């Protein structure tokens, strides 16, 4: 880069030079990070560590426990073990008919 005397520059030119330096530093940092992640994935030492979900105060959402797939008795696929209803259907009480 060529030598520039900073004493003779006005504020706008100094801000433009500072902005150019700032953008170059950010681009180099982002590109370096991308290369580090790519190398870690290729070499097999990149892994994501999932933290335990916190309480409601972290995100305002209750943590949901995975209880597995829901199996509805009338929605079984043909050929699956236990095909059909698991229990007998019950009629509703006479006052609701």
UniProtKB/Swiss-Prot annotation:
Q: What family, per the record?
A: Belongs to the SGF11 family.
Q: Which residues carry this modification: Phosphoserine?
A: 92
What this chain does, per the record? Answer: By binding to ENY2, interferes with the nuclear functions of the deubiquitinase (DUB) module of the SAGA complex which consists of ENY2, ATXN7, ATXN7L3 and the histone deubiquitinating component USP22. Affects USP22 DUB activity toward histones indirectly by changing the subcellular distribution of ENY2 and altering ENY2 availability for ATXN7L3 interaction. Regulates H2B monoubiquitination (H2Bub1) levels through cytoplasmic sequestration of ENY2 resulting in loss of nuclear ENY2-ATXN7L3 association which destabilizes ATXN7L3. Affects protein expression levels of ENY2 and ATXN7L3.
Annotated keywords: Chromosomal rearrangement, Cytoplasm, Phosphoprotein
Query: Primary place of residence?
Result: cytoplasm
Q: Which GO terms describe its cellular component?
A: cytoplasm
Question: Does the keyword field hold Phosphoprotein?
Answer: yes
What more is known?
Encoded by an expressed retrotransposed copy of the ATXN7L3 locus that emerged prior to the speciation event separating primates and rodents.
Query: Could you describe the subunit structure of this protein?
Result: Interacts strongly with ENY2. Interacts weakly with USP22.
Q: Give GO BP annotations, semicolon-separated.
A: regulation of gene expression
Subcellular location field: Cytoplasm
Q: Sorted alphabetically, which InterPro entries does this protein's record hold?
A: ATXN7L3B
Organism of provenance: Homo sapiens
* Record region (Disordered): 77-97
Superkingdom of the source species: Eukaryota
- Spell out the protein name for this chain: Ataxin-7-like protein 3B
Give the disease entry from the UniProt record. A chromosomal aberration involving ATXN7L3B has been found in a mother and her two children with varying degrees of neurodevelopmental delay and cerebellar ataxia. One child also exhibits episodes of unresponsiveness suggestive of absence seizures and facial dysmorphism. Deletion at 12q21.1 deletes the entire single exon of ATXN7L3B.
